[in-house]
């Protein structure tokens, strides 16, 4: 079994090498798609690719970001690999805490073709802000940002199909032919909030994107600063905290979103049905009038 990663990056110079090095502990190849980085990220990944042939530059474009960039990379390389191989959607600011391959082998043994991760969101807190001017910027992001909560889950792994493409008009984390979910999930450290400057730039990029990141557009500009006392402190080599109450809160929120989504869809179907009934009545009345005339 081979594990290949797809990594889309834009202006992640402060963390991209740490992300790639972490993933290279278990990935056979990492295919990088640079979305017009201007902060030195492009130069860093080019140098990395020169020194490590497992890092492959798949594309470099100034197109507006779309989730379908992942589809494009998959379509470029999927026929190079076997049915037993897997793909890893590697976000440029994420690092798994463990090798996922043993879990992927178990997923295959159970005839599954998709696996999610639990996301440990690492926050820039009031404690980080107070110490920011004095902190050692030479330390890695994971050494400087320690406060987290595990509160989200997303698909990150899917099984390869040598014969099937991933249509580029479809959005989503995994292809539509990979819907058999393996429920156990590894934990992924997500460093979306690293410095005040990076947080501001990240938000601006997302606000200016007409196609994606609607969840960001619904938040205020000052929503990012978290209180350290509301988080757990990460120490490498120790088990991460994931209380049962946090799991309940997550599943409750997902149930709420699902019910809202179902209600909206039922309402839309009802409106469509009423519209069709009205059109049919008009059609029947017109035909009856023409017949009687």
Task: Walk through the language-model features, giving the residues of each.
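Cell-envelope/extracellular polymer assembly enzymes that use nucleotide-activated donors
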Residues: 2-4
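Short, well-formed alpha-helical segments that are part of the catalytic scaffolds
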Residues: 11-28
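Conserved beta-strand positions in the Rossmann-like core of class I SAM-dependent methyltransferases
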Residues: 31
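A conserved acidic beta->alpha catalytic loop
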Residues: 34-45, 61-65, 91-92
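Conserved donor nucleotide-binding strand/loop of the catalytic core
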Residues: 50-68
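Catalytic-site signature of metal-activated, phosphate-bearing donor transferases
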Residues: 68-74, 98-293
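Active-site nucleotide-sugar/metal-binding loop of Leloir-type enzymes
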Residues: 71-86
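Short beta-strand-to-loop acidic/aromatic patch adjacent to the donor-nucleotide binding site
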Residues: 82-97
């Amino acid at each position: 079994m081979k594990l290949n990663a797809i990594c889309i990056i834009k202006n992640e110079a402060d963390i991209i090498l740490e992300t790639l090095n972490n993933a290279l502990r278990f990935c056979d190849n990492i295919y990088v798609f640079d979305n017009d980085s201007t902060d030195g990220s492009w130069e860093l990944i080019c140098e990395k690719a020169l020194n490590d042939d497992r890092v492959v530059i798949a594309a470099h474009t100034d197109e507006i970001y779309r989730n379908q960039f992942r589809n494009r990379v998959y379509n470029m390389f999927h026929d190079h690999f076997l049915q037993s191989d897997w793909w890893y959607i590697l976000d440029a600011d994420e690092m798994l805490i463990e090798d996922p391959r043993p879990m992927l082998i178990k997923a295959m043994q159970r005839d599954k073709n998709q696996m999610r991760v639990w996301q440990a969101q690492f926050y820039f807190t009031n404690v980080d802000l107070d110490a920011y001017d004095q902190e050692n910027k030479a330390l890695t992001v994971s050494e400087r940002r320690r406060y987290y909560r595990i509160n989200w889950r997303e698909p990150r792994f899917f099984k390869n199909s040598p014969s099937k493409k991933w249509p580029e008009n479809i959005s989503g984390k995994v292809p539509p032919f990979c819907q058999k979910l393996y429920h156990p999930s590894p934990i992924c450290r997500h460093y979306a909030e690293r410095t005040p400057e990076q947080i501001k730039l990240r938000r601006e990029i997302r606000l200016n994107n007409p196609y994606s990141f609607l969840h960001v557009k619904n938040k205020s500009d000052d929503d990012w600063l978290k209180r350290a006392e509301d988080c757990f402190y990460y120490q490498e080599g120790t088990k991460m905290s994931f209380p049962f109450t946090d799991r309940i809160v997550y599943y409750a929120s997902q149930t709420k979103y699902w019910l809202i989504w179902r209600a909206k869809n039922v309402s839309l179907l009802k409106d469509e049905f009423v519209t069709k009934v009205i059109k049919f009545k008009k059609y029947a009345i017109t035909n009856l009038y023409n017949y009687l005339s």
